[in-house]
Amino acid sequence: IRDRHSAERIKGAVLYTLEDARSKSGHLFLPSEDLVKETLLLLNAPIPIPEQRVRAEEVQETLQQMILHGAVVAYKQYLYSPRVFGQEDDTARMIAERLANISVAESIESALESVRESLGITLSQKQEQAVRTAFQHGLTIITGSPGTGKTTVLKAIIEVFKNLHPKGKFALMAPTGRASRRMAESTGVDEARTLHSALGLGTGEEIGDGERVRFVDADLVIVDEFSMVDMWLAQQFFKRIGQHTRVVLVGDPNQLPSVGAGNVFYELIHSGMVPVTVLDWIFRQSKDGLIAYNAKFINEGSTKLYYGNDFVFVDSPTQIETARRIQDIYCKEAAERGIENVQILSPFREKGEAASEQLNRAIRERVNPFRSAEEEVKIGNRTFRVHDRVMQTKNTEKVSNGDLGFITGITTDSKGERLVQMDFGGDRKLTYTPEQLAHVDLAYATTTVSYTHLRAHETCA
């Protein structure tokens, strides 16, 4: 476009700015003042002469025309792209309808007492409140930091439901394969599914208007790790849940929010519309359970920390010395506990000696050094060896982004292509081609962001 002041150029910049804010920063909307400011920066970046630059008035005038013609949606002082506004508006409407739909409160006292005896558990007042609330409303939320007994509450809810409805159907879901497997293991239920699998979705926002919606056939749906759910996935979830299905959303509001746009869990908690039970008593009280306490202190803004067997602070003057000490600690712990039970976390991927990529290479040379060319494969500037600890970085049908495993073998097929055998636990023993290794990283060390929702017995952070 030759005319740098044309309405078409300004329109394109406005829409680009909104999409950039969504995809890079997770914003569903921008305040009008911010949108004008960011759009001007984009429009005027290639114009060095101040007198020739686009003025704020021009952007504001074009914005008004875009709002009039539906190219941008204005809600109060906030501006949305029509697609994103539709997602939020649709989700809010479905939640409001669910809350307005009077759910029959069930008397659970007899069932709850029976469950206490069968599971051999004693529930705190807050835990009992969470269980009761789940059977009094169509939509409820349970939150709490690590160690506050969320899993015990889920077990109790499931058992009370089975006691009340022997032929009833319930479904457990979580955003990732890793979280769903952990949910099934911790509750003792045969199956928990990913949201995408349970809802019949792909891995992205490719659901068309005419595509058939698969409804979830369940009387009770429990979703764990709901803080990871973005606005698009929340819309797809509520679209597929029947109005008479009880829904329990569970999560830690202090965990990192969803990668996609929209902080749905936080907004639901603070809306004042959804019944919320906050579990705030830490039950892990052993001398080896200090991490849960320290996480609570940090969330509360306290500088107090407990130190002991499972929480140690090691002072180090430089990154080089830090990297050396991390390697020494890792090798000692891995020798005692096994590599699968030790994990290094770093806030950086590439920057500095203590970044995860540098630590991965250094650690690997100590715990899994070169043996023979037959036992390693080079992909670009990366090398993988038999016995390497690895992490999957992209969701597939069998493994999820963040899943950890080991390389168990490297072979060559009849065409001379190198194939890598991976073991991610259970029946997930897979063979990778060189192309598929693009979505695999060494995982002796990883970034704190990548590690969100993973577990290891020992962590060097």
Descriptions of predicted regions:
Residues 146:
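The conserved Walker
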Residues 452, 456-459:
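Conserved small/polar residues in nucleotide/adenosyl-binding loops
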Residues 1-107:
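Accessory, non-ATPase domains that flank or precede helicase/AAA+ motor cores in DNA-metabolism machines
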